[in-house]
Amino acid sequence: MGVQPPNFSWVLPGRLAGLALPRLPAHYQFLLDQGVRHLVSLTERGPPHSDSCPGLTLHRMRIPDFCPPSPEQIDQFVKIVDEANARGEAVGVHCALGFGRTGTMLACYLVKERALAAGDAIAEIRRLRPGSIETYEQEKAVFQFYQRTK
């Protein structure tokens, strides 16, 4: 039986969710129960017990805490989500607490998916997940992604 991971919420229901670092095997089972088949880990160290759930594919992108993802990491994240969603599979993304790095990636995906301006995507992620996108550099990464993709 799955147990909801800390700070779990859908940003695009059934397609893309954010969460804090999963720490228990039951957290991974919850993700599987929700249809999540891909977990993007943005922490420098891998999530504990991630090998406890063979039905979940782990994608590692090491980003230091309070830092923004690189343009290449953002592009890789968008590709993972697009490819998984095209197969009907949902994606979860996490950092330590599910706010800074996670929120940044989620906002970038909204820029691409909903054709939102960077400020609107940041505002929407903060509405859905209060406290998200913690630093100026993380905000700047969303604006730079918007500039690259418009």
Curated annotation (Swiss-Prot):
Coiled-coil ranges from the UniProt annotation: none
Active site per UniProt: C95 (phosphocysteine intermediate)
InterPro entries noted in UniProt: Prot-tyrosine_phosphatase-like (IPR029021), PTP (IPR050561), PTP-SAK (IPR057023), Tyr_Pase_AS (IPR016130), Tyr_Pase_cat (IPR003595), Tyr_Pase_dom (IPR000387), TYR_PHOSPHATASE_DUAL_dom (IPR020422)
Catalytic activity: O-phospho-L-tyrosyl-[protein] + H2O = L-tyrosyl-[protein] + phosphate; O-phospho-L-seryl-[protein] + H2O = L-seryl-[protein] + phosphate; O-phospho-L-threonyl-[protein] + H2O = L-threonyl-[protein] + phosphate
GO terms (BP aspect): dephosphorylation
Pfam family, one: PTP-SAK
This protein's GO CC annotations: cytosol; nucleoplasm
GO molecular function: phosphatase activity; protein serine/threonine phosphatase activity; protein tyrosine phosphatase activity; protein tyrosine/serine/threonine phosphatase activity
Keywords carried by this UniProt record: Cytoplasm, Hydrolase, Nucleus, Protein phosphatase
PROSITE patterns, A to Z: TYR_PHOSPHATASE_1, TYR_PHOSPHATASE_2, TYR_PHOSPHATASE_DUAL
Major localisation: cytoplasm
Documented EC number(s): 3.1.3.16, 3.1.3.48
Cellular localisation: Cytoplasm, Cytosol; Nucleus
Organ and tissue specificity: Widely expressed.
Functional description taken from the UniProt entry: Protein phosphatase that mediates dephosphorylation of proteins phosphorylated on Tyr and Ser/Thr residues. In vitro, it can dephosphorylate p44-ERK1 (MAPK3) but not p54 SAPK-beta (MAPK10) in vitro. Able to enhance activation of JNK and p38 (MAPK14).
PANTHER family, per the entry: TYROSINE SPECIFIC PROTEIN PHOSPHATASE AND DUAL SPECIFICITY PROTEIN PHOSPHATASE (PTHR23339)
Family as reported in the entry's similarity comment: Belongs to the protein-tyrosine phosphatase family. Non-receptor class dual specificity subfamily.
Protein name (database record): Dual specificity protein phosphatase 23
Taxonomic placement: Eukaryota, Metazoa, Chordata, Craniata, Vertebrata
